[in-house]
Amino acid sequence: MKKIALLGSTGSVGTSTLEVVGQHPEDFSVVAMAAGTNIDLLTLQVETFKPELVSVGNEKAAVELRDRLAGKSQPEIVYGAEGLELVARHEAANFVMTAVVGSVGVAPTLAAIEAGKTIGLANKETLVSAGPVVMKRAKEKGVSIIPVDSEHSAVYQCLQGERMEDVAKIILTASGGSFRHLSREDLEQVTVEQALAHPNWSMGAKITIDSATMMNKGFEVIEAHWLFDLPYEQIECVLHYESIIHSMVEYKDRAVMAQLGTPDMKVPIQYAMSYPIRKKLPTEPLDLVKIATLHFAAMDYERYPLLKLAYECGMAGGTHTAVLNAANEVAVDMFLKGAIRFLDIEKVVRKTCEAHSGVASPELADIFAADEWARSYALVSI
């Protein structure tokens, strides 16, 4: 049985992970979970899945959770950054699902690696910020990192049984996000509500905004570089409006392997959790006859300048991608709060990245320092 430590249980990926666990109680159990401050939902999750250890965002949330569970069988309750790491390395867990949002995922992912856990990685910011440190340590510890992002899961599946030296390139598909049919001029006036209406996927607020700016795809390019040890020149992005082909791998003989399916995050979540076995999943089957036509278009890097910037930062290496991620987190948060306009996200991120001198071969402390600097700079650059 897979005994799961779940980081980010109340988020989009976290709740979908628990749905998968609930559908296969004979195969999966949750022994530890971490959430932020959504105590209403977390209380229900704790009562349903009965973990041994629970971490919340702060001490106030910990007190509230204890009060909610008064008179019932209670798990050990911890909080904060230390609590996240305790969940990640919980002794009873043999699989850690990292589904928290943002660079907060770096430390618990490293804690899980040090503890020798198999990792289902749904937190792309971990590799964007700290890819060289995380992947080096995972290799040293012999830890498997199985991607949960639909695109990277697709590539991972297409690579099974193949040799990496036979890969010509990987092709990441992108829906184009909420505003794919709008001109740059139209983007000046878009609202938060419009930006949160993704055409194909149901996701959290930040990743939906990142999809609209195409920053999400930029992060996926950087993540793919680290996951599959490929140079950026071998990672291509293409627009695919239906989100049916999740990604592709082209080999040296020009054969192309693709993974298709209806847009449902439970598919890559369950694949990571049950790997290398596939289990039945009650989701809508793919009906190609009903779909009839799939559409593709070349990526427009002038239309999506943050994707272009992600390639630039990735190729620059070092701490540049940590700064890219931190500046984007600040800018998206400000947009969601109504403090800046949609296109200001791009301006804040580029201005911050251009001001960064960078550390070429960073240690973890250098990455955290770059992250902190970028957040401060981005705030005053608005």
Curated annotation (Swiss-Prot):
GO terms for biological process: isopentenyl diphosphate biosynthetic process, methylerythritol 4-phosphate pathway involved in terpenoid biosynthetic process. It is an enzyme of class 1 (oxidoreductase). Its EC number is 1.1.1.267. SUPFAM superfamilies: 1-deoxy-D-xylulose-5-phosphate reductoisomerase, C-terminal domain, Glyceraldehyde-3-phosphate dehydrogenase-like, C-terminal domain, NAD(P)-binding Rossmann-fold domains. The keyword Oxidoreductase applies. The keyword Ribosomal protein does not apply. It catalyses: 2-C-methyl-D-erythritol 4-phosphate + NADP(+) = 1-deoxy-D-xylulose 5-phosphate + NADPH + H(+). Pathway: Isoprenoid biosynthesis; isopentenyl diphosphate biosynthesis via DXP pathway; isopentenyl diphosphate from 1-deoxy-D-xylulose 5-phosphate: step 1/6. Keywords: Isoprene biosynthesis, Manganese, Metal-binding, NADP, Oxidoreductase. NADPH binds at T10, G11, S12, V13, G36, N38, N123, E125, G204. Transmembrane segments: none annotated. Belongs to the DXR family. Catalyzes the NADPH-dependent rearrangement and reduction of 1-deoxy-D-xylulose-5-phosphate (DXP) to 2-C-methyl-D-erythritol 4-phosphate (MEP). This is 1-deoxy-D-xylulose 5-phosphate reductoisomerase. The gene is dxr.
